[in-house]
Amino acid sequence: MNQVTISNLMIQMKDEPLSEDLVRHMVLNSLRSYKTKFSKDFGELVLCYDDKHCWRKDYFPYYKQNRKKARSESSLDWNELFDILTKIQNELEENFPYKVLKINGAEADDIIAILSNKISSTPNLYEEILIISGDKD
């Protein structure tokens, strides 16, 4: 979910200062839009989040190094942004009717893959799945 938000922020913010209220507004607006557009055909929203410490980094030390370099060259305060995103994630989990999934050591992609595999391999269960992601992989 954070990658979707970050993708939207990069398009919307341009040179505006980072604002917790703006980020929250964008997240809630996006979720409302997805629910309105897709809930009839795809059911409820399940929000998947990356854990801060991914298992891939243990095996591939240079995993996401390009991202780290790009962030260091950016004027955006990435620590502040991730703090805001974590706060909003907690608010969603505590105050909204969405299923919020975050698993120690896993990325959202891992969670999505396991859920998709489980649904597609369950006998007599056919369910359309829509995945919305800001990831490029």
Regions found by a protein language model. Give the residues of each.
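Noncatalytic, basic helical substrate-engagement surface that gates or grips nucleic-acid strands
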Residues: M1-I132
